[in-house]
């Protein structure tokens, strides 16, 4: 990128070199990490703008600093657009991350020591849904639910039984590694029966929800959180949607509760991202993500890999690599050696340690942003299975690298 050469390199050549190498890495490798994506140039430019210079504690029209008239415009645009996308009553776009958005929801609605029921991390949940190493697991009493051993899908009757026994104050629906549709209507019914609030973390599926390709949680949930940088294809950040009755508590939980000044350059980029998400092109892009995931999952299964739950309904899949005599850690390293990036990931009822795992998580948002489709995904599956089958063969690795290079050359980034 020319501006790195022009502005950064003369001042800090070490940082400039690292940025240039990262740009080359993104260009020359195929990104299959489900939580990563490539923003548009418009989003990137907004995030790199003079908005980074402005402090703006508070909310539009009620700041603790002067000179906020233009950052107010940007934040209002971001709030209005995200409410339009999801049909929400209230939005707060200030959370710096999905984790901070989730923490704000907990502290807006609960008292320390109350009970949260969330999806088990080892079954596809997220750290912020009650893991003992996270603040959510330290401040609150956690009860978890998971997937059925046979179907590897959420068993809603079992979930109901756990909820009625535990009587949590809040049920969290959402996941970081669950490839199937979430039934928010059932979650709502269970929450009502158990006397619990319903909080949905839609970080992974927000883009699909925006495009109407996954049921929306907004009509059912008391609170909805998300990141902006996964399927939404925006900057790294978070937001919260809620019913109007919770608006004041949510806003106060974000500021001054867990954050100080908002990152106005990031909020500007969020506003641009939300405008892009309102276009027909964005909906077509989300359909391509889902189609690509289905094609890739089918191709991997046809070539001897086991995909958890037998496929995917969304943008990601969990691949059990044990049929190839591998663990997730080794599979991740092998694929990295041919310029495909994935992450090792636990599969349900995984006998391996979290640092080893039996599977890998594979997602299609980033490769879809590069415009890969159909036969490209089948070629990608061929490269993956070639090298996992014969990972000790340098000849096979070279063949797989040629497949990856051809796809990268065909679909360059930021041309």
Swiss-Prot record:
Question: In the Enzyme Commission scheme, what number(s) does this protein have?
Answer: 2.1.2.1
Q: Which GO terms describe its molecular function?
A: glycine hydroxymethyltransferase activity; pyridoxal phosphate binding
InterPro entries, alphabetized: PyrdxlP-dep_Trfase (IPR015424), PyrdxlP-dep_Trfase_major (IPR015421), PyrdxlP-dep_Trfase_small (IPR015422), Ser_HO-MeTrfase (IPR001085), Ser_HO-MeTrfase-like (IPR049943), Ser_HO-MeTrfase_PLP_BS (IPR019798), SHMT-like_dom (IPR039429)
What this protein catalyses is: (6R)-5,10-methylene-5,6,7,8-tetrahydrofolate + glycine + H2O = (6S)-5,6,7,8-tetrahydrofolate + L-serine
Say which domain of life the source belongs to: Bacteria
Q: Which UniProt keywords apply?
A: Amino-acid biosynthesis, Cytoplasm, One-carbon metabolism, Pyridoxal phosphate, Transferase
What name does the UniProt record give this protein? Serine hydroxymethyltransferase
A Pfam family annotated for this UniProt entry: SHMT
Positions carrying N6-(pyridoxal phosphate)lysine are 230
Q: Give the species.
A: Syntrophomonas wolfei subsp. wolfei (strain DSM 2245B / Goettingen)
**Pathway noted in the entry:** One-carbon metabolism; tetrahydrofolate interconversion; Amino-acid biosynthesis; glycine biosynthesis; glycine from L-serine: step 1/1
* Keyword field contains Amino-acid biosynthesis: yes
Q: Which PANTHER family match?
A: SERINE HYDROXYMETHYLTRANSFERASE, SERINE HYDROXYMETHYLTRANSFERASE 1
Which processes are annotated in GO (biological process)?
A: glycine biosynthetic process from serine; tetrahydrofolate interconversion
List the cysteine pairs that form cystine.
none
Report the locations given in the UniProt record.
Cytoplasm
